[in-house]
């Protein structure tokens, strides 16, 4: 479900960016609301990740790269989906902010925190980490 949710957030964000770029006067409020909502949801999910990672790190040797970038902790298809979703979020955010700088479109750059948070959630729930040496 985490992969589907990550792609769903990416799609909602990208679909809100298109009208905001075409008609910034009327559609920028929706883009702003979507961006802030996804950022806040990402922050909350990130806190859950940190709590779960702290609990799991008692038994497993976990690193930041393995938790949030799935380095060595997730199968290739999972990496491609979750990191792919994160990359699309980054591209949409940077593109929107670059095409109309110094506007509320810059708030889109906060959105990729949710993609990163879904990577973290997947890894702390399902990731493969070596056991911690006692």
Regions flagged by a language model, labelled:
Residues 98-105:
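Transmembrane helix interruption/hinge and helix-loop junction motifs
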Residues 20-24, 53-60, 100, 124-131:
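Perimembrane helix-loop junctions in membrane proteins
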Residues 1-41, 82-85, 90-98:
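Long, highly hydrophobic alpha-helical transmembrane signal-anchor segments
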């Amino acid at each position: 479900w985490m992969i589907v949710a990550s792609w769903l957030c990416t799609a909602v964000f990208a679909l809100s960016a298109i009208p905001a770029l075409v008609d910034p006067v009327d559609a920028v409020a929706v883009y702003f609301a979507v961006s802030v909502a996804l950022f806040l949801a990402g922050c909350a999910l990130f806190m859950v990740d940190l709590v779960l990672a702290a609990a799991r790190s008692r038994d497993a040797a976990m690193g930041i790269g393995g938790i949030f970038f799935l380095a060595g902790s997730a199968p290739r298809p999972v990496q491609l989906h979750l990191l792919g979703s994160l990359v699309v979020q980054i591209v949409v955010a940077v593109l929107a902010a670059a095409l109309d700088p110094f506007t509320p479109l810059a708030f889109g750059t906060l959105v990729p925190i949710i993609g990163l948070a879904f990577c973290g959630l997947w890894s702390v729930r399902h990731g493969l980490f070596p056991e911690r040496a006692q």
